[in-house]
Regions:
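Second-shell loop/turn segments in exported
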Residues: 20, 51
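Active-site-adjacent betaalpha module
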Residues: 2-6, 28, 32-40, 52-178
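Short acidic, Gly/Ser-rich segments with clustered Asp/Glu that frequently serve as metal-coordination loops
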Residues: 13-19
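N-terminal nucleotide-binding beta1-loop-alpha1 segment
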Residues: 8-12
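N-terminal beta1-alpha1-beta2 module of alpha/beta enzyme domains
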Residues: 21-24, 30
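Conserved beta/loop motifs at nucleotide-recognition and modification sites
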Residues: 43
């Protein structure tokens, strides 16, 4: 029998998504991914970021209204980019028997990337839902980087995390295999 897969929906919150690339499309595609997972009995884990300007329960902390966790789905609160640091995520995944994680959400260059790196380092195989993560445009010095470019860069580079004992995959939301 293959390893159990879990879908991690990371930080698709009102405050996190302000100014991000293709928010409406990403939220819709994550909704489809979550619906597919539920139909196939794949657990969904919801991760929400909180910090001083986005406190637990505040308007910005709320998940996008199109995305509603079902009773019994795990909710994990975090305070830094890596969803494993200072959270019960590892225990939640162990309790589910999950060894393969499908990652979707925001922001590509922060919480998605950090969680992907940690997951692989911890021995989880990962699938990045290539069209179901997003980022905001940014700049470094005189160089501007669009949210679309950040998404494309993570899609392009994620395979570099692979190791002999851990699979790293890239798949569109509607092509992720469970």
């Amino acid at each position: 029998m293959g390893s159990v897969t879990a879908v991690l929906v990371i930080d698709l919150q009102v405050g996190v998504l302000e100014g991000c690339f293709d928010v409406e499309g990403v939220v819709a595609r994550v909704g489809v991914l979550v619906s597919r997972a539920r139909r196939e009995g794949v657990p969904v884990v919801w991760v929400q970021h909180e910090e001083a300007d986005m406190l637990h329960g505040s308007a910005g902390w709320q998940l996008m209204p199109e995305l509603v966790p079902k009773p019994g789905e795990a909710m994990v609160r975090k305070t830094c980019c890596d969803a494993f640091v200072g959270t019960p995520l590892r225990g939640v995944l162990d309790g589910l028997g999950a060894r393969r994680l499908v990652l979707a959400g925001a922001q590509s260059d922060y919480c998605i990337r950090a969680t992907a790196h940690r997951a692989v380092g911890e021995g989880y195989s990962i699938v990045l839902a290539s069209d179901a993560h997003t980022a905001a445009s940014t700049a470094f010095g005189d160089v501007s980087i669009s949210g679309e470019q950040i998404v494309a860069h993570l899609n392009r580079s994620i395979g570099g995390l692979a190791r002999p004992d851990v699979a790293v995959e890239l798949a569109a939301h509607d092509a992720v295999g469970f």
